[in-house]
Amino acid sequence: MCFMTFFNGEKPILFPDITYSFYDVWAEEFRIPYETQPLDDDFNIRKEDYYKENGGVIFPNPNAPTGVEASQEMIEDILQHNQDVIVIIDEAYVDFGAETALPLLEKYDNLIVVQTFSKSRSMAGMRIGYAMASPELIKYLNDVKYSFNSYTMDQTALDLGVASIDDQAYFEETLHKIIQTRERVKLRLTELGFTFRDSKSNFIFASHKSCPAEELFEKLKEKDIYVRYFKKPRIDNYLRITIGTDAEMDEFLSEVEKYLKETGRL
């Protein structure tokens, strides 16, 4: 919806080269020119790359698939250098430990912060998402939504969304469990020889020092354990490991350890 509403000029929009996989899909679908900006070797945004003339900026924070968080200082710097275009911060995973950019809405009328119920509230099938921005930008979004919205919500979805917000205790308890498990898994992965950047999401983007990611991905798949492998430049030796229950993660870690020992890598 934001792409349709705000990214309709002749100048290219900017987003990272390693990012949510649908940004380029939407840009191509709506014939929006775009340029990807390379993250640095630690998967951080290089703010200077966004100083150039452009038709808009969008990036996820924390990043998907890396889980790396951009600081609020960096986000504000990008906003200061892009006050004539729309800047969208995609906070799909923000509840898992990252800092929201919402306070910056008071200072920047060109900022849009989007969030979703699909991740931290486990309601992907309900298709509930929302944007927060100045009244003027929300009006423009509504104008397009009432004409072209393909993600309409029925009363059941709306009722479930309200129930999710009302049960804040369960929401916070679930987040705490996921974060706690994530930190435990990170420690064990380090012991097993993996490296990764600090994740502020519900997944870990990890690479092993001697076991190729694709090889481990295929081995885990044989055991009906599914992690995400990206056969793309720069990240083709990483696995995105989503945090499940403690029992699921114990099984995952056990199979990884077993395979590393069998192949003489541990």
Range-by-range predicted roles:
Residues 1-12, 210:
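Phosphate-binding glycine-rich loop
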Residues 11, 32, 82-86:
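A short helix->loop->beta-strand "cap" motif at the edges of active sites that frequently abuts
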Residues 40-95:
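Active-site phosphate-binding strand-loop segment of PLP-dependent enzymes
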Residues 110-190, 194-197:
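PLP-dependent aminotransferase class I/II
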Residues 73, 218-223, 228, 232-266:
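PLP-dependent enzyme catalytic core of the Aspartate aminotransferase-like
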Residues 179, 191-223, 239:
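Conserved PLP-binding catalytic core of the aspartate aminotransferase-like
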Residues 17, 36-40, 115, 230-231:
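Short beta->alpha connector loops at strand-helix junctions that form conserved
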